[in-house]
């Protein structure tokens, strides 16, 4: 477990339309629970990379971009399968603002983690839209956080984004731990090491 008496916290910036954010949630939550460290999910809206199709005549740059995108997509599917997660939704052109506002509401009511898991699961299994206010409200109500009022929370969403960017966040998933910033769940071993007080060998 983490060192007693220390005010450790894991802050994780996520976007519901970002598959890497979904893949990071389970392992991060499990580690936080094991170490007894609070996990705070923070909304950060991002752009979605578009997977381009092969054309008969491609420039070298176009081909390299396509190959990278194809590898990225295959990599996501590989790790999703290991976690038994569905990744069937198309995130291209999706506006996640409403779902991120729901996360702010869920955080205020103490159900942010369960809300995020539910939204990720439903969206990526293609059973809900991220801009569906009714679905978001229903999830929050089921979790004991009724009365979702998105209109009053846009300013807070912008404030959270500005604060995160001032701390070095530029994408998702990104971790803010012990005054340091890490991009991607591949840094979880290092984050664990920091939270354990650097008592073990450096995980590199």
Q: What would you call each of these model-derived segments?
A:
Residues 1-37, 118-204:
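C-terminal cap of thioredoxin/glutaredoxin-like
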Residues 23-123:
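Structural alpha/beta surface segment adjacent to cysteine/selenocysteine redox centers
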């Amino acid at each position: 477990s983490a060192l007693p008496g220390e005010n450790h916290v894991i802050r994780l910036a996520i976007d519901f339309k970002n598959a890497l954010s979904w893949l990071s949630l389970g392992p991060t939550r499990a580690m936080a629970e094991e170490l007894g460290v609070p996990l705070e999910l923070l909304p950060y809206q991002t752009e979605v990379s578009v997977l381009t199709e092969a054309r008969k005549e491609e420039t070298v740059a176009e081909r390299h971009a396509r190959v990278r995108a194809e590898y990225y997509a295959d990599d996501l599917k590989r790790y999703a399968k290991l976690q038994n997660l569905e990744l069937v939704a198309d995130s291209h052109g999706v506006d996640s603002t409403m779902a991120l506002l729901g996360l702010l509401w869920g955080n205020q009511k103490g159900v942010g983690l369960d809300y995020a898991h539910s939204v990720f699961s439903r969206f990526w299994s293609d059973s809900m839209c991220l801009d569906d206010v009714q679905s978001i409200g229903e999830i929050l109500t089921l979790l004991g956080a009724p009365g979702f009022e998105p209109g009053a929370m846009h300013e807070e969403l912008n404030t959270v984004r500005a604060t995160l960017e001032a701390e070095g966040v530029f994408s998702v998933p990104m971790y803010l731990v012990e005054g340091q910033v890490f991009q991607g769940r591949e840094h979880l071993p290092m984050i664990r090491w920091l939270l354990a007080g650097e008592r073990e060998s450096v995980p590199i």
